[in-house]
Amino acid sequence: EGAKGVDLIQELKKARAEGKVLRVVFLGVNGVGKTLTIAKVARRLMMTGFKPVIAAADTFRAGAIEQLENYASEVGVEVVSRKYGSDPASVVYDAVQRAIARGMDAVLADTAGRMHTNVNLVEELRKILRIAGEPQLKILVLDALSGNDVLYQAKYFMDHVGFDGMIFTKVDANAKCGGIITAVHQTHRPILFIGTGQSYDDLEEFRVDAFLSEILG
């Protein structure tokens, strides 16, 4: 519905053909399942023959780095991190440099999600996006069960930093998630994947026809 398509694998192939590292920056508020989603995406890329590295650029939320490192070790992906309170953009910069030096394909960057409590977050995200460089893909992670909050969050990030596509989590819990369709309609951005469970393999490409048949079924 007016959403331009974004294919993560095709973007990776294009970057690889040009000898470049794709920078994938994950946006989203705390509690939507962003960290697990990054691990799922990393696993999917590895299964497709790509080599990603994860940047632990949420240096604000207590436990965020350890959680990400735990997930990453379970899927076998390297993490670049610094201590809490570090400049998140510098973590992303380090990860990009490591990826370039080691001939890796993508940097998957986690970011802070303290939307409601800290106005500096937007400036922090803008700096991360600027330092990360091109080619770049911004993915907004949303919780399918958040109701009207989904649209509010999508609009907030679109207005302040923009994004190229969305991943919805917790779709398994309730197939009738009208907020998903509304978010696509309002932002004109596509849904790349949906999270359908807690396993690292529970990440499916979003197929609008199948989803609509679930809703209308």
Predicted regions and their residues:
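Primarily NTPase-proximal linker/entry elements flanking Walker-type ATP/GTP-binding cores
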Residues: 1-57, 64-84, 91-100, 105-109
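Glycine-rich, flexible loop/turn motifs
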Residues: 4, 8, 75-76, 111, ...
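Short glycine-/small-residue-rich Rossmann-like dinucleotide-binding loops
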Residues: 30, 112-113, 143
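Conserved catalytic-core segment of NTP-binding enzymes
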Residues: 87-102, 116-217
